[in-house]
Swiss-Prot record:
PROSITE patterns: AA_TRNA_LIGASE_II. This is Asparagine--tRNA ligase. Its EC number is 6.1.1.22. The lineage of its organism: Bacteria, Pseudomonadati, Pseudomonadota, Gammaproteobacteria, Enterobacterales. Homodimer. It catalyses: tRNA(Asn) + L-asparagine + ATP = L-asparaginyl-tRNA(Asn) + AMP + diphosphate + H(+).
């Protein structure tokens, strides 16, 4: 007997009258007076469950079937038939059913068949994948990740796995998690009374990475086109719907590329993955449009067909100053654009995705290439209608003397970045890249308002459960 996913049955990939087996969990059970039970069985392979029609002639009908409740795990064998009812094209006429796991107490089962609040689901994160929404998020997350890998592979990029433990602060902001095996009750001290990290596991201070970019640059300067994709960490005490202490980042780096090159790459990449999710996860996206955000599908369709606008930071500030809109955060040249500024530009002024370029150097990182005006750097943000910034990137500073001067300006010790400086000493090239926060991308695609609900087990200030 062939075991098939529920998706194959519902999507017509199994011939009518063929007997197959599906394995999954009961979503609902209803019984008719005619001695027939209808089980909705899901296995996570698609959004909808398959209906299994079970006749009371089965030998374990009274002992097992009539006691099944939401969450019980079952193996159902049956014949695929065209469904006479609404809601599905095919169903199973069961010939056998095996219960592999019961729910101990249906009355206290945390995932009972009713709508649960998002806040409640975070408290039972180990069970929330069983819900419609989190299951759909998981499938969309998978499809987006696979589409990103596929896009870069087709473009000739190599995936590089950069370290999670580092001694470098990529952003220079100092919001890093320290990694240490020192005894907190008996810390070694230097003669000056400071913690002696020479005695630590790595012989120096070590941290969880905030970005794979610096390491990625080393491989871009040898393989030409690379990308990193993995977890990153920020010890930022932010309890907002847009922040996580642990999240995933995608970061391409391209040798011999300028800012315009990677702006074009970002546009092509986003359109590629949005098109993929619309085509491959139509069932889940239909759910998000019906239950979470009515604009979810239409937003992506508009994005895929839109031409990106491009504007210099200086011109963007002028637009915002003259627009007559009352902003909560004042806007002037030299300030970093807030979410409300970004969304005004994308949603009201340009009515399209926008690439803002050439930001003031004082609000950007040390590694961004200084422009000829000496005041701005070759940095960019991609702003999307409905969310604001979705990508941040830059051309990297390839001139050693300028890089050293920028480090000095920002109080960084060049000795801590000797290996990074070597890239400028041995065959330096112009190169550029960007970073995409994966959870923000998923939130944008699905319309889910909080990034805590698009990652399996969110890590936030004072929360590291599960």
């Amino acid at each position: 007997m062939s075991v098939v996913p529920v998706a194959d049955v519902l999507q017509g990939r199994v011939a009518v009258d063929q007997e197959v087996t599906v394995r999954g969990w009961v979503r609902t059970r209803r019984d008719s007076k005619a001695g027939i039970s209808f089980l909705a069985v899901y296995d996570g392979s698609c959004f909808d469950p398959v209906q299994a029609v079970i006749n009371n002639s089965l030998p374990n009908y009274n002992d097992d079937v009539l006691h099944l409740t939401t969450g019980c795990s079952v193996i159902v064998t049956g014949v695929v038939v065209a469904s006479p009812g609404q809601g599905q094209s095919f169903e199973l006429q069961a010939t056998a059913i095996e219960v592999t796991g019961w729910v101990e107490d249906p009355d206290t089962y945390p995932m009972a068949a009713k709508r649960h609040s998002i806040e409640y689901l975070r408290e039972v994160a180990h069970l929330r994948p069983r819900t419609n929404m989190i299951g759909a998020v998981a499938r969309v997350r998978h499809t987006l990740a696979q589409a990103l890998h596929r896009f870069f592979d087709e473009q000739g990029y190599f995936w590089v796995s950069t370290p999670l433990i580092t001694a470098s602060d990529t952003e220079g902001a100092g919001e890093m998690f320290r990694v240490s095996t020192l005894d907190l009750e008996n810390l070694p001290r230097t003669p000056e009374g400071k913690v002696d990290f020479d005695k630590d596991f790595f012989g120096k201070e070590a941290f969880l990475t905030v970005s794979g970019q610096l390491n990625g640059e080393t491989y871009a300067c040898a393989l030409s086109k690379i990308y990193t994709f993995g977890p990153t960490f920020r010890a930022e005490n932010s309890n907002t719907s847009r922040h996580l202490a642990e999240f995933w980042m995608l970061e391409p780096e391209v040798a011999f590329a300028n800012l315009n090159d990677v702006a074009g790459l970002a546009e092509a990449m986003l359109k590629y993955v949005f098109k993929a999710v619309l085509e491959e996860r139509a069932d889940d996206m239909k759910f998000f449009a019906e239950r979470v955000d009515s604009d979810a599908v239409a937003r992506l369709e508009r994005f895929v067909s839109a031409d990106f606008a491009q504007v210099d930071y200086t011109d963007a500030v002028a637009i915002l100053e003259k627009c007559g809109e009352k902003f909560e955060n004042p806007v002037y040249w030299g300030v970093d654009l807030s979410s409300e500024h970004e969304r005004y530009l994308a949603e009201k002024h340009f009515k399209a995705p926008v690439v803002v370029k050439n930001y003031p150097k004082d609000i950007k990182a040390f590694y961004m290439r200084l422009n000829e005006d000496g005041k701005t750097v070759a940095a960019m943000d991609v702003l999307a209608p409905g969310i604001g910034e979705i990508i941040g990137g830059s051309q990297r500073e390839e001139r050693l003397d300028v890089l050293d001067a920028r480090m000095e300006e920002m109080g960084l010790n060049p000795a801590d970045y000797s290996w990074y400086r070597d890239l400028r000493r041995y065959g330096t090239v112009p190169h550029s890249g960007f970073g995409l926060g994966f959870e923000r991308l998923i939130a944008y695609v699905t319309g889910v308002q909080n990034v805590r609900d698009v990652i399996a087990f969110p890590r936030t200030p004072r929360n590291a459960s599960f």
